[in-house]
């Protein structure tokens, strides 16, 4: 994370400083379908070409975020949470795991992603060495005019029918394609066959899992000239082969308070996601925000910029693309600026 994101005064330090929010530096992934937008538009400054994903909030073994401000700067988020498990929260399902149960990403799809499916927790626990499955939620940050997603199947089908269609290159006739636009949201339950299409810029909130079973990858080759591995047997074992209803975008229902509006985007057993819009340019009162003891929270800034004023007067500046982690039972901050966030809770 570059220094532009951090402006912490050092008036004094005390025990309460350990409960202040901190910035996270992401891990980058250079999958072949990625582009340049995360560096160009979100100032990620990651030396990868292409840059397909940034894991903004992650403690996964395949890539942990790095703390980029405050007392723990330079440590991995995984290290910090192992030192301070109380930062995760008091809810029983969080304490039972003792680790971060979710991951938050930005995804830049310059090309189509593979047609894929993720296992649920039970299957992953039994067949993938106790790992989590993967249910996820997508929020569309931007989309090309013709951008689309694959969202399940058009009709009920059978394993062998899909297997044959993969072998003869006709899988796409079974797939439900959905046009997308900026601001759309989609809930992708484990077992749903899906794919992000070219031209989509996505924020993804998901279980902390990197398990993906590919059904079809357009016969592409990687930088070494090799086709990427398919996982057809496992994919067909976990896939929901019933037709999926075409998703309908919900009516927007905002809750307002001075300088702030918020709406619930997604509620499931794994996470809650709100969209929060802050604009204090025309009001004297800053927007208060903090986590409670039950769970950590994460604010992902998807547009705009501003600052967070701590109780001791220290200031944390944030910009578009920044990810801020709030330990459970955090100090209260006052937010000033004009910005949009995804507000993630467990």
Model region roles, listed by residue range:
Residues 1-157, 217-248, 273:
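Transition-metal
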Residues 99, 107-112, 143-146, 192-212, ...:
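Ligand-binding loop in jelly-roll beta-barrel domains
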Residues 104, 113, 130, 136-139, ...:
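His/acidic/aromatic-lined binding-pocket segments of jelly-roll/cupin-type domains
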Residues 156-168, 294-305:
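Short, basic/aromatic beta-hairpin or loop at an interaction surface
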Residues 165-214:
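Loop-centered beta-sheet repeat module
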Residues 175-187, 310-330:
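Short acidic-glycine-tyrosine-enriched beta hairpin
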Residues 213-289, 293-296:
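C-terminal amphipathic alpha-helical segment
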Residues 283, 304-309, 323:
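Short beta-strand segments in beta-sandwich/barrel cores
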